[in-house]
Amino acid sequence: MSHNTFGHLFRVTTFGESHGVALGCVVDGCPPGLPLEAEEIQAELDRRKPGQSRFTTQRREPDQVKILSGVFADDRTGGRQLTTGTPIALMIENTDQRSKDYSEIRDSYRPGHADYTYDVKYGIRDYRGGGRSSARETAARVAAGAVARKVIPGVTIRAALVQMGPHAIDRSRWDWDAVGNNPFFCPDAERASFYETYLDGLRKDGSSVGAVIEVVAEGVPPGLGAPVYGKLDADLAAAMMSINAVKGVEIGDGFAAATLRGEDNADEMRAGNGGRPRFLANHAGGILGGISNGEPVVVRFAVKPTSSILTPRRSVTRDGAEVDLVTKGRHDPCVGIRAVPVAEAMMACVLADHYLRHRGQTAGGG
């Protein structure tokens, strides 16, 4: 299996399976001299780890990260642990696997999962928790994202769940401070209260639901990205689409832009500070022609309902026999919830990569 690496200068390779011994990543291309402690990475992992509320999988993984390489500290660094510029290897052990929960689907394909496609491509698959196709892999991405944040000075990256099923938030009540005060990473406290009742009902029915996640990067300098095949928004779309269960991505107004007239969609400008233009709107989501314009970079993506549910579903075995499946094990009733910190991590990794690429191809060396 290839294609486990993404990025050009800031490169991330992830490894591991849901029920393997461990998972992790190797970050290559991180500049030297950046302070990096395990506690900083751990803080991001703690936001994603399972078992923190009744609304996520009850698999309880501490997700303790170990930095295996790429950092150094002594009296010359003032005791601070700094990156050395060499590959940074990060490892997270799996401690709460229950592989027996999956023995009944060893030879059957779960509808909505990658079971069949992995089998038909590779001729072998790790059926325990989905193996490499499990969302457990995203823990490694979150760890890499914590490193990436060190590379992009002055950039603030935040994400939120803005819709669950058909129920969107009221954007007039958007409050970033509310995101950390409810189990859904929801910026609308009133809607978050509704989500509790809504998701409890779905859990009782043994079902699941999808979600929409919005991630915003503020402080992104103008000039990141390149025309045609190096577009910032193209790389962001690819990064978000690579997250498990994501089925659609939009930048800025996205598909809503198709409903607007040209005069409504145009991000008009007036003279701003320092000779740079001041944008009067941000329909483009901070990217024009594949290059950042200094406005907030805004990305949204749709996450499908968790395919592992208690409702009987029709399927077939590897031998072609028809079966009815009920998926056992511990699963997220809304996998979109824990996709929020993953979205931030992928935004950070893409921006870090483009930031380093930009430094090598800039007018005046800026």
From Swiss-Prot:
Keyword Cell membrane: no
Binding, FMN: R132, S133, S134, N244, A245, G289, K304, P305, T306, S307, S308, R330
Amino-acid positions noted as binding NADP(+) in the UniProt annotation, renumbered to this chain: R48, R54
UniProt KW keywords: Amino-acid biosynthesis, Aromatic amino acid biosynthesis, FAD, Flavoprotein, FMN, Lyase, NADP
Pathway as given in its UniProt record: Metabolic intermediate biosynthesis; chorismate biosynthesis; chorismate from D-erythrose 4-phosphate and phosphoenolpyruvate: step 7/7
EC number: 4.2.3.5
Swiss-Prot/TrEMBL catalytic activity: 5-O-(1-carboxyvinyl)-3-phosphoshikimate = chorismate + phosphate
Gene Ontology biological-process entries: amino acid biosynthetic process; aromatic amino acid family biosynthetic process; chorismate biosynthetic process
GO molecular function, a single term: chorismate synthase activity
Subunit-structure text: Homotetramer.
HAMAP family: Chorismate_synth (MF_00300)
Record protein name field: Chorismate synthase
Organism: Methylobacterium radiotolerans (strain ATCC 27329 / DSM 1819 / JCM 2831 / NBRC 15690 / NCIMB 10815 / 0-1)
